[in-house]
Amino acid sequence: MAAEDFALPADHNPLDTDLLNVFCWVAKTQSFSRAAAELGTSQPVITRKIGRLEECLGVALFVRSNRGCVLTAAGTVLIGKAPSILLQLAEIKEEVSHSASVVSGSLSMGITHAASTVMAPRLLPVIARRWPKLQVDVMEALSRTLVERVLHGELALAVLFDPPPHPDLICRPLLIERLCLVGNPQSDLRTMAPPTIRDLARLPLMLPSGGQIIRNLLEDAFAEINEPLKPVYEAASMAMLREMAVQGIGYTLLTQGGVAEDVAAGKLIAQALPDKGMVVTLTLITKRESTRLRNVRLLSDFVASEIRAVARQGQWPGHPTVVGG
C-alpha cells in the first residue's frame, strides 16, 4: 500500500500520546495532584499538559473545583477512546521492536502474599535468565486491589484468588487451595480436631474486612448454619491479621501458602477446614485486550506453567489441587 493511501495530511496536528496518558491519569484519579504523584512529576507540569491538550482539541476536558475535577462531556468522549488508542500504540511498538524475536521491554505483574511467598523467589531469577532484556516489576497486594489494577491497565497480569467475573478479563485457574484455621502454637488449635464451621462460630475470629473472598466464603457458610458472623477484629491487611494471630489475640483463616513461613518458623499452626466449599482458587488474570501483546502472553504462560509445576512436584504448602495445564 502506498503511503498516500493512509498518511495524514501534512498540515494535520496529531495528538501527543504523552498528553493523552496524562489525561487518562487525571480522569482516573479525578485529581491533578494525585495524577502528578502517580506519574512522579509535579502538579504544575500536569496542569500545563492538560492545558496543551485542551488547546489542541479546542475544548475543556475537566471542570475543576477545590475537591478535584470531573470530566466534561468532551472529556467523557475522550476517555472512552484514549486508553484503547494508547494500548494500540503500545502494541505497534512491541510488534516492531520485537520483529527480530528479541524479548525486551518492561511488564508489571501483581501477586497475592500467599502466592508470592512460594513463587516470587523462584520466578524472578528464572525470568531474568530466560529473558535478560525483559524487566518485570512485581507488586504484592490483596486480590481485590490486583483485579482493579489489571482492569485499569496498571498491571499486565496478576495471580490472585477467585476474581469476580468480568467481560474484560481472561481468567486462568491454576490451583485449588483449602482454607486453614490459623492460630498461635500455644492456642487450643493444637489439640483441636479438624475444625468445622460450627467450631468457628465459637472462636474469636479476626477476619478480612467485607468484600474479600475469605470473608465472603465465611459469611455464606455461617448463613447456612444460621449463625451470625461476628469477628472480634476486622482488617484489610492480611499481614496484620497474621501478626495478631502470632500474638495469640485470636484466630484467622488463610491458605497454607499464606502462612507457610510462619508455620515453619514455629510462630503459627494451621489446621485445614474440612467443610465443603472452604476452598479458594488461585487464578492468573489478564485484561482481554492485553493478550494481544506477545510479552504478556509469554509471561502469562510461563508463570502459569511454573506455578502448576511447583504444585505437582509437591513443593506448594498444603498440596493444592492443580487445575488445567
Curated annotation (Swiss-Prot):
PROSITE patterns: HTH_LYSR (PS50931). The keyword Transcription applies. Residues 15-72 form the HTH lysR-type domain. One of its GO terms (molecular function) is DNA-binding transcription factor activity. Keywords: DNA-binding, Transcription, Transcription regulation. CDD domains: PBP2_Nac. Gene3D superfamilies: Periplasmic binding protein-like II, Winged helix-like DNA-binding domain superfamily/Winged helix DNA-binding domain. Residues 32-51 bind DNA. The keyword Nucleus does not apply. SUPFAM superfamilies: Periplasmic binding protein-like II (SSF53850), Winged helix' DNA-binding domain (SSF46785). It comes from the Bacteria. PANTHER family: HTH-TYPE TRANSCRIPTIONAL ACTIVATOR BAUR, HTH-TYPE TRANSCRIPTIONAL REGULATOR. Belongs to the LysR transcriptional regulatory family. This is HTH-type transcriptional regulator BbuR. It comes from Bordetella bronchiseptica (strain ATCC BAA-588 / NCTC 13252 / RB50) (Alcaligenes bronchisepticus). The lineage of its organism: Bacteria, Pseudomonadati, Pseudomonadota, Betaproteobacteria, Burkholderiales.
